[in-house]
């Protein structure tokens, strides 16, 4: 599915820490939601966004409202969509870093209630352009996201087919779950 059309309150965009949204979901966010890009550049310049410390942008309008052909026909069109800018790499030229992703997931686990996140959509962090493998990232993401007491969705990379055996409960959460 298309994460930007999810019904989740908070949508995650994987980013670097230097303020460049050149490819992938980040590039799409940059062009579809210019305010997100402006905020992203600001938090990069001010060093508020760094590996292990995502930045939550609490926008005041919904994605549904902005993407719909007939916004006035939408129920609940006044609900805001927030963006979680989640660093997966320091510089856009580099590969994503598993340790930084894990630290960011720990931040989400430790701060989602305080920040008011009520539901969360995430891409497969670092997979695709970040050059990490779902077999490594999937279980890590599921470990942390399963600890959240809110609805969560993970959107798999469109560029590569994830083998079915890597999508089982045993593969993602271990056999003791």
Outline where the language-model segments fall.
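Macrodomain-like recognition of ADP-ribose-binding/processing modules
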Residues: 1-177
């Amino acid at each position: 599915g298309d994460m930007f059309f999810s019904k989740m309150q908070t949508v995650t965009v994987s980013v670097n820490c230097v303020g460049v949204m050149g490819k992938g979901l980040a590039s799409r966010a940059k062009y579809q939601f210019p305010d997100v890009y402006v905020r992203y550049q600001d938090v990069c310049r001010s060093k508020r966004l760094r590996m292990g410390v995502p930045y939550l942008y609490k926008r005041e309008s919904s994605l549904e409202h902005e993407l719909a052909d007939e916004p006035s026909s939408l129920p609940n069109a006044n609900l805001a969509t927030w963006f979680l800018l989640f660093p997966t790499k320091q510089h856009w030229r580099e590969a994503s870093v598993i340790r930084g992703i894990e630290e960011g997931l720990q931040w989400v686990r430790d701060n989602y209630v305080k920040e008011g996140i009520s539901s969360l959509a995430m891409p497969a962090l670092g997979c695709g352009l970040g050059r990490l493998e779902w077999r490594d990232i999937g279980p890590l993401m599921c470990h942390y996201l399963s600890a959240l007491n809110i609805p969560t969705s993970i959107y798999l990379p469109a560029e590569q087919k994830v083998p079915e055996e890597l999508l089982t409960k045993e593969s993602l959460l271990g056999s003791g779950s």
